[in-house]
Amino acid sequence: MAVTHTAADVTAATTMTNAVADIEQETPEIEKERQLAGVGTGTGAGANNKKKPHDHALASILGPAFVAAVAYVDPGNVAANITSGARYGYLLVWVLVLANAMSVLIQYQSAKLGIVTNKSLPELLGERMSDAGRFMFFMQAEVIAIATDLAEVIGGAIALNLLFGLPLFIGGLVIGTISTVMLWFQGGKTQTTFERIIIVMLLVITFGFIAGLFVAPPNPGEVVKGMIPCFQGADSVLMAASILGATVMPHAIYLHSTLVNDHYAGGEKPSIKTQLKGSKIDVAWALLLAGTVNLAMLVLAANSLHGMSGTDSIDGAQRAITQVLGPVIGTIFSIGLLASSLSSTSVGTYAGSEIMHGLLHVNAPMWACRVVTLVPALIVLWFAKDPTQALVIGQVVLSIGIPFAVIPLMRYTHDKELMGKWADGTAKHVIFMIVVALIVALNVLLIVLTLMGRA
């Protein structure tokens, strides 16, 4: 295992080094390349970038995918992974690996769309819809944004309650305030600062959810065995559907196509070819990190919480971790949960703002977008007896919104008129169709089973 891991690291490092060298050597000729490819120059967020180049080549590689990746380690994922490991042990490890592989493809496709067209997915949707269609699409996207923020704010409120004993409603206010302050750095010359804040948060999340494995290392043989696809009864199939169905977050798809252009707000863009090469590395490393965190949560629960009762809620899981692994690990877990909430709710609001801009051509203040999605979460925290139930409801709402994001993405990346020579070939398009069909089918299954009272 150690030798394989080292070889993979060397290969990844070599790939990154080569990409950085390409970026440093290549003279950007963006407009010429777009014309030769048959692609419009666009009027998106990153259309007028003629400022000085980034000081370091790495700045043109890493960032956007790491911001999008926080959607994959939000409190909803924490709840799903901990529950899966506690109930079924290592059984569904293979589901997480498969889910992460699909995520890499989808997030890269979103980045590719933004790089080639110089527009975001919401902008492209808005250009192809009537006024009524744009408004209806925006309304469903806004409901999805509210459902997303619901889970993230509740998770943060629970973390503050576990760490400091704050009432859930007060904790929700604190999360809303801090995440709004973080959003001050989003956009313009401070966009890179915002990306770095999110990356630091992602590293805190990683440490928070992996620390327990150093205290109670898992059985490598059991982890490998979990890579073999199998189930144990209908309930485990439902759990797998929940994990896979929750893998792709609609707002992460919408946002990534914006992030790749916002990333260059403070510098000159490399060529499309170089951006695509850099984006592959960005997505691979970011989702490798996010996938590792998710796997660590499941393995931690499988190794230390398997068979224990009361682990079907985030606070119950934290108390069980504290009981089994000690208060230090329990506290570190809570800190990871807090970082997960703060980063994911900031990114969710960012996505909501870009969706509004792309579909309605309205540049609303970020604080206004923050208030719209925060208020429903605070209402739930004030009135609900069991806020964890809101996470389940929110997940179902998210499932409804996924087809509206992935299906247009699949169509646009195969559109030669839109993408020029960068359009997906037949083989890649077929693979993407299969992935999209699987994700949509699993989300429909999750919705139906939830409405039937079986989820």
What is the role of each PLM region?
Residues 56, 83-108, 122-126, 133, ...:
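Extracellular loop-to-transmembrane helix junctions
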